[in-house]
UniProtKB/Swiss-Prot annotation:
Gene Ontology biological-process entries: immune response; mononuclear cell migration; positive regulation of mononuclear cell migration; positive regulation of T cell chemotaxis; regulation of actin cytoskeleton organization
Protein's recorded name: C-C motif chemokine 27
Binding partners and assembly: Monomer, dimer, and tetramer. Heparin avidly promotes oligomerization. Interacts with TNFAIP6 (via Link domain).
InterPro entries: Chemokine_IL8-like_dom, Interleukin_8-like_sf
Origin species: Mus musculus
Record gene name: Ccl27
SMART domains to which the protein is assigned, alphabetical: SCY
Superkingdom in the source lineage: Eukaryota
Length: 120
């Protein structure tokens, strides 16, 4: 993990975090392996269509936040595990694939619904 950022390297990251586009908002930095912030807003369908694969980041050991990491072609986006738009998308994917949903999707859905907090 990175120990710290210089002010010059923090500015581009800050600008990305303030960007309204979710795919640019919280990219997973290539030099780290853990999400440090989570995207909590509804996910646009154009972003969901571009998912190459997903993984679940557990809040244990090296990483301090539980997150769903959406890997796109050129970047990764860290999403809150209870994001409602992600849950709806996973549900639609499950219906579309009719029982062939990868086990990760089932694990994600189980974890999302095991903590009944209000989330987008």
């Amino acid at each position: 993990m990175m120990e710290g950022l210089s002010p010059a390297s923090s500015l581009p990251l800050l600008l990305l975090l303030l960007s309204p586009a979710p795919e640019a908002a919280l990219p997973l930095p290539s030099s780290t392996s853990c999400c440090t912030q989570l995207y909590r807003q509804p996910l646009p369908s154009r972003l969901l269509r571009r998912i190459v694969h997903m993984e679940l980041q557990e809040a244990d050991g090296d990483c301090h936040l539980q997150a769903v990491v959406l890997h796109l072609a050129r970047r990764s986006v860290c999403v809150h595990p209870q994001n409602r738009s992600l849950a709806r998308w996973l549900e639609r994917q499950g219906k579309r694939l009719q029982g062939t949903v990868p086990s990760l999707n089932l694990v994600l859905q189980k974890k999302m619904y095991s903590h009944p907090q209000q989330q987008n």
